[in-house]
A protein has these predicted regions:
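N-terminal amphipathic, basic helical "cap/leader" segment at the start of enzyme domains
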Residues: 1-93
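Small-aliphatic-rich amphipathic alpha-helix that forms the alpha element of a beta-alpha
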Residues: 42, 110-158
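Short secondary-structure junction motifs
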Residues: 51-54, 138, 142, 169
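Short Asp/Glu-rich motifs
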Residues: 61, 155-156, 162
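A glycine-rich helix N-cap at a beta->alpha junction
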Residues: 84-87, 159-173
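Short acidic/His/Gly/Ser-rich catalytic and metal-binding motifs that mark active-site loops
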Residues: 102-107
């Protein structure tokens, strides 16, 4: 049996997805396109009980620089400045969160599964990260996945205005 062209195209995108660390501010698509991709895939990525606990904030330009300066500062200089500067040199960053208020609501509504909702939320967030990263690859947008949290959580909240109920999961410069 021959696999169809849709599968082959999908497989090619997955196979080509890699961490890109040599970032710059030039995008092959508009910032609005990037935001649309993130919004669309946040809505379309499945999760248990359709809880929709995944959240994302996209920052560009000066706000991107503020995010990476805040990350550097949160570590009191214990991370390599060249590394955070390299991420800040990119066009933007996607910040991935889990909305804990959604999880709490689901736990109250479905008590028998209460201990599973945090696990399912992490799984769904991982799928979202993969979906967006792969979509970026298909658009020629380089990215990587970073995990400076929880050390940076409060600093990121201050820079972005993210609600206290949102738990930072990952950063994709």
């Amino acid at each position: 049996m021959a696999l169809n062209s849709d599968y082959q195209a999908f497989k090619n995108v997955v196979a080509a997805r890699r961490s890109v660390y040599a970032l710059n501010a030039d995008l092959p698509v508009s910032e609005d396109d990037i935001v649309s991709v993130v919004k669309d895939l946040t809505e379309l990525t499945p999760d248990a009980f359709n809880q929709k606990s995944a959240r994302a904030i996209v920052v560009f330009g000066e706000k991107n620089r503020e995010v990476w300066d805040a990350i550097y500062d949160a570590f009191d200089g214990k991370v390599d400045r060249a590394k955070t500067d390299a991420f800040a040199a990119g066009a933007g960053t996607v910040l991935y969160f889990i909305d804990r208020s959604i999880i709490q609501s689901m736990q109250e509504q479905y008590v028998l599964y209460a201990d599973r909702f945090p696990v399912w939320a992490q799984q769904a967030n991982g799928m979202l990260q993969f979906n967006i990263w792969s979509a970026f690859r298909s658009l020629g947008v380089g990215a990587s996945l970073q995990h400076y949290n929880p050390v940076i959580d409060e600093a990121i909240r201050e820079v972005t205005g993210a609600p206290a109920s949102w738990e930072l999961v990952a950063q994709a410069p």
